[in-house]
């Protein structure tokens, strides 16, 4: 497995004839994964809104007036109940997101309890909590955390157009710090923020050339939220989106590639092309933080139509 890809190589792959690109991605995908299996993750917002960061796409930022209802950290009993529901629906991983720049230690202690309780249910755990200090990463490691999510979102060149309260390098430093503690990484991006195709390739290339590639790579389609400033003038070309999925599979052959936000706006046919291109995971359950997703019965019907089966065991 390579982590010395060049931009020139990646762009040449992206620009292959689409059917050739899909064939190449699917061939690589089959070396490492069962092409008829899909991993299911479910995500719970454990603390909603009032985030001090100014990410221009995000409904949870305190900088913008949105319809979002702010909510404090959920209680442990609610968390356990939601995790049990996730397991019943076929999820193997339970993800917990909190709208913080950085957690306070007193709040992180509660999150660590949550991790321990979810692990008791036989589920993998993932959290996304913002920027962390080293002693906080150690706390998460001790609690048994499997994955830490910290998306790079876009290229270093475009980053200042989506957020100015922190930098691209801040995010990258967090990824590297978490990895030092042996916690698996979940990191991807958002397509459709107004970035160029070169920006998309640059973002993927950064992840693919890390010393250890992320084990999970969520790819989000931008969803416009009323009240937030980002409002790209053009829609995402569906074939370009499929190309990004296929390029991700080729650059990161062992990673789970997850279709994340924006699936509500994707047709069954487009999602199926993404699965052909190497996507093998979704966020499931009708809600992704503050945006809507397909209902479980919609996804189950699609899986039935195309012959996909949910992975039944924890994925490592």
Swiss-Prot record:
Pathway: Cofactor biosynthesis; biotin biosynthesis; biotin from 7,8-diaminononanoate: step 2/2
A molecular-function term among this protein's GO annotations: 2 iron, 2 sulfur cluster binding
UniProt xrefs under SMART domains: BATS, Elp3
InterPro entries: Aldolase_TIM (IPR013785), BATS_dom (IPR010722), Biotin_synth/BioAB (IPR002684), Biotin_synthase (IPR024177), Elp3/MiaA/NifB-like_rSAM (IPR006638), rSAM (IPR007197)
Root EC class: transferase
Catalytic activity: (4R,5S)-dethiobiotin + (sulfur carrier)-SH + 2 reduced [2Fe-2S]-[ferredoxin] + 2 S-adenosyl-L-methionine = (sulfur carrier)-H + biotin + 2 5'-deoxyadenosine + 2 L-methionine + 2 oxidized [2Fe-2S]-[ferredoxin]
Residues engaged in binding [2Fe-2S] cluster: 95, 126, 186, 258
Cofactor binding description: Binds 1 [4Fe-4S] cluster. The cluster is coordinated with 3 cysteines and an exchangeable S-adenosyl-L-methionine.
Any GO BP: biotin biosynthetic process
Binding site for [4Fe-4S] cluster: 51, 55, 58
Domain of life assignment: Bacteria
UniProt KW keywords: 2Fe-2S, 4Fe-4S, Biotin biosynthesis, Iron, Iron-sulfur, Metal-binding, S-adenosyl-L-methionine, Transferase
Cofactor(s) essential for the protein: [4Fe-4S] cluster; [2Fe-2S] cluster
Residue ranges annotated for the Radical SAM core domain, each copy included: 36-260
EC number of this enzyme: 2.8.1.6
Oligomeric and partner information: Homodimer.
Family stated for the protein in its record: Belongs to the radical SAM superfamily. Biotin synthase family.
PANTHER family in the record: BIOTIN SYNTHASE, BIOTIN SYNTHASE, MITOCHONDRIAL
Stated role: Catalyzes the conversion of dethiobiotin (DTB) to biotin by the insertion of a sulfur atom into dethiobiotin via a radical-based mechanism.
Protein name (record): Biotin synthase
Organism: Lawsonia intracellularis (strain PHE/MN1-00)
Gene: bioB
């Amino acid at each position: 497995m390579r982590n010395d890809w060049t931009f020139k190589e990646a762009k040449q792959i992206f620009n292959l004839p689409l059917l050739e690109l899909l064939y190449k991605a699917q061939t690589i995908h089959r070396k490492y994964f069962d092409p008829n299996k899909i991993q299911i993750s479910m995500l719970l917002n454990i603390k909603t809104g009032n985030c001090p960061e100014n990410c221009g796409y995000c409904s949870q930022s305190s900088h913008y007036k949105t319809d979002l209802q702010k909510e404090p950290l959920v209680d442990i009993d609610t968390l356990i109940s939601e995790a049990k529901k996730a397991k019943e629906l076929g999820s193997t991983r339970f993800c917990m997101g909190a709208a913080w720049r950085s957690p306070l230690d007193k709040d992180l202690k509660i999150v660590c309890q949550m991790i321990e309780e979810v692990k008791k249910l036989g589920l993998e755990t993932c959290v996304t909590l913002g920027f962390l200090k080293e002693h906080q990463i150690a706390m998460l490691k001790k609690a048994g955390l499997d994955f830490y999510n910290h998306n790079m979102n876009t290229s270093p060149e475009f980053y200042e157009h989506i957020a100015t309260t922190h930098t691209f390098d801040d995010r990258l430093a967090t990824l590297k710090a978490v990895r030092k503690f042996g916690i698996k990484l979940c990191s991807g991006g958002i397509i459709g923020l107004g970035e160029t195709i070169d920006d998309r390739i640059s973002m993927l290339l950064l992840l693919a050339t890390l010393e250890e590639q992320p084990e999970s790579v969520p790819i989000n389609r931008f969803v416009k939220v009323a009240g937030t400033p980002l409002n790209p003038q053009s829609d995402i070309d569906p074939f370009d989106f499929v190309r990004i999925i296929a390029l991700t599979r080729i650059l990161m052959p062992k990673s789970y590639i997850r279709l994340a936000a924006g699936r509500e706006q994707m047709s069954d046919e487009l999602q199926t092309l993404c699965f052909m291109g190497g996507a093998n995971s979704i966020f499931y359950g009708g809600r992704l933080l503050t945006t809507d997703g397909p209902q479980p019965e919609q996804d189950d019907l699609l899986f039935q139509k195309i012959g996909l089966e949910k992975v039944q065991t924890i994925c490592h």
